[in-house]
């Protein structure tokens, strides 16, 4: 079946494009882009169009990269659940038994997921055309940027659809897609900025390289996904995939998780073969030993291997070569936790609703505090242990005699570790809070990611935007206080005194240390930002924990919550 008479495509388009969410999201997307253009519009009274104004190029780069990042982050939310949604709705077996060819199924899912994103990107074209009369950017650069953008979105969409073939849950497919897509997004941004001064070469490379890479990645993934649907794995009752953890460990490639050995048992303890001890929390024990890893360990193994692969070069560059840039390695650790943490918390309550066991859980003799802490600590334990694996290079650098800078900044390292720990707690709390409100795990996970992006990424983006386009304005203090909510800003603001290749960053000059207004040699003005972050994060977690405890005490509120 072709594109025009593909029933999968027709059904998906009707479901996706005729909902209120589609129109609301399109309106918000356009309003956000228009707001960026409006506030970043040059304030000069006179513009010399014969020159190449840098302000215009900055504006267009901001628009393109913002558009690219937002669209790239939205792609897995539309495509990662294309196949896993059928599995969760228990229609996957019916779809495989239909006369549709697997290629038609994959093609219909891919085109349907990408159609709405194509509409979002295409409708942004009139907005960017407003910048062309300002000069500095040619029409061919705009054309090349949109060609590269569409090629990237098609590639990311195919990665997300293919990920849904190998996972049963949308949450696992979503996280696996992000693990693969985010490094590609960063590489694309680096490519765009590295050729900023060579506009013609960037246009030629974009028009030639991006389509070739898109075909090289998308075509093999399309064939692999079609073959997997043609020869699916064993299906159990209700069309559920039968997963044997021992067989999966034998056939796995690369990392193998041994649940009975250290350190794997820290985040994946083996299944219980004896009775629980008296006073043990049955919710916590069930979540840790059966629930979290009940659908296999493929997503977990992929997350560990990708994170370790990226950590090796980042560790060498930021922790040993350019030690003044070591906060960027902490940013990588924080980003990993923001990506992996909600997976183990955002489905804690929604999974009970999907199995229709939540009412049974709420009518047991377990207290609300036991249910709440069991759900929270299980997800927090897994995410924090996985995140701690990435902190071993920092601990190693602290103990290495040939790198004395970190021992000289011992309190700074402790503050970094504290920021990572608070971030782990916040991601688990936000995920569990969203899971208490929504009915589907996929919805809860997407909302959790959206909340964390608004909480941790939007404030530093607003601060950077204000510094660039409103350097002397009353908005500066507001942007400073908002940025205090983000741990990414906090790890950079904490003072770090290192002798990096013979030079010390001016903002962290040694002359500031030891002043009269200081704590252990660090000026109070450098500690102020981290203190605000510490206080704000503690208040947020206390408020979320208190709210969820109240909800679990009022059992009917959790039981009857809907989308």
PLM-predicted stretches and their roles:
Residues 75-96, 109-110, 325-329, 342-362, ...:
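Transmembrane helix boundary and interhelical loop/hinge segments in multi-pass membrane proteins
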Residues 104-117, 161, 165, 370-383, ...:
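Start (N-cap) of specific transmembrane helices in multi-pass transporter permeases
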Residues 10, 96, 106-107, 285, ...:
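Short, surface-exposed helix/turn micro-motifs that flank interaction/cofactor sites
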Residues 15, 25, 91-93, 113, ...:
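General helical structural elements
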Residues 15, 87, 102-103, 109-110, ...:
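Internal catalytic domains of large membrane-associated glycosyltransferases
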Residues 1-72, 81, 120, 126-347, ...:
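Transmembrane alpha-helical segments and their membrane-interface loop/helix boundaries
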Residues 93, 106, 174-175, 359, ...:
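Hydrophobic/aromatic positions within or immediately flanking transmembrane alpha-helices
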């Amino acid at each position: 079946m072709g594109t025009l008479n593909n029933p999968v495509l027709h059904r998906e388009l009707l479901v996706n494009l005729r909902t209120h969410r589609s129109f609301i999201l399109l309106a918000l997307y356009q309003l956000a882009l228009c707001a960026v253009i409006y506030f970043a519009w040059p304030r000069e009274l006179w513009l010399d169009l014969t020159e190449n104004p840098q302000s215009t190029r900055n504006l267009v780069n901001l628009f393109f990269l913002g558009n690219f990042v937002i669209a790239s982050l939205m792609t897995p939310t539309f495509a990662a659940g294309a196949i896993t949604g059928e599995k969760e709705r228990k229609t996957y077996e019916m779809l495989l038994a239909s006369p549709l060819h697997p290629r038609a199924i994959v093609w219909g899912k891919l085109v349907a997921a990408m159609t709405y994103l194509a509409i979002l990107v295409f409708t942004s074209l009139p907005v960017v055309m407003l910048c062309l009369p300002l000069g500095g950017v040619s029409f061919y650069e705009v054309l090349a940027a949109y060609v590269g953008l569409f090629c990237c979105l098609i590639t990311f969409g195919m990665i997300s659809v293919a990920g849904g073939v190998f996972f049963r849950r949308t949450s696992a497919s979503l996280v696996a897609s992000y693990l693969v897509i985010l490094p590609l997004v960063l590489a694309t941004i680096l490519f765009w900025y590295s050729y900023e001064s060579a506009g013609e070469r960037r246009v030629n490379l974009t028009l030639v390289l991006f389509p070739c890479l898109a075909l090289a990645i998308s075509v093999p993934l399309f064939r692999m996904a079609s073959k997997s649907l043609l020869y699916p794995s064993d299906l159990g009752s209700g069309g559920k995939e039968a997963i044997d953890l021992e067989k999966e460990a034998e056939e796995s490639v690369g990392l193998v998780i041994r649940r009975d050995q250290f350190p794997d048992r820290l985040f994946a303890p083996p299944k219980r073969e004896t009775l629980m001890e008296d006073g043990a929390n049955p919710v916590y024990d069930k979540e840790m030993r059966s629930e979290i890893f009940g659908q296999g360990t493929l997503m977990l193994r992929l997350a560990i291997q990708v994170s370790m692969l990226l950590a090796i070069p980042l560790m060498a560059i930021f922790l040993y070569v350019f030690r003044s840039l070591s906060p960027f390695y902490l940013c990588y650790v924080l980003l990993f936790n923001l990506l992996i943490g909600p997976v183990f918390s955002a489905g804690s309550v929604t999974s009970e609703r999907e199995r229709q066991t939540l009412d049974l859980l709420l009518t047991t003799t377990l207290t609300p505090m036991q249910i709440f802490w069991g759900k929270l600590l299980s997800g927090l334990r897994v995410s924090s242990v996985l995140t701690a694996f990435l902190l071993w290079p920092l601990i190693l650098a602290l103990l290495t005699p040939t790198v004395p800078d970190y021992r000289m900044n011992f309190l700074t390292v402790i503050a970094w570790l504290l920021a990572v720990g608070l971030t782990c707690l916040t991601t688990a709390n936000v995920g569990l809070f969203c899971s208490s409100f929504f009915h589907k795990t996929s919805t809860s996970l997407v909302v959790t990611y959206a909340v964390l992006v608004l909480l941790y990424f939007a404030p530093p983006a607003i601060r950077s935007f204000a510094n660039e386009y409103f350097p002397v304005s009353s908005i500066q203090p507001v942007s400073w206080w908002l940025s205090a909510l983000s741990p990414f800003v906090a790890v950079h603001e904490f003072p770090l005194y290192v002798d990096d290749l013979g030079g010390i960053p001016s903002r962290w000059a040694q002359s500031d240390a030891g002043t009269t207004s200081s704590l252990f040699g660090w000026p109070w003005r450098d500690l102020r930002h981290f203190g605000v972050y510490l206080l704000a994060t503690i208040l947020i977690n206390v408020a979320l924990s208190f709210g969820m405890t109240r909800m679990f005490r009022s059992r009917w509120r959790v039981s009857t919550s809907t989308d």
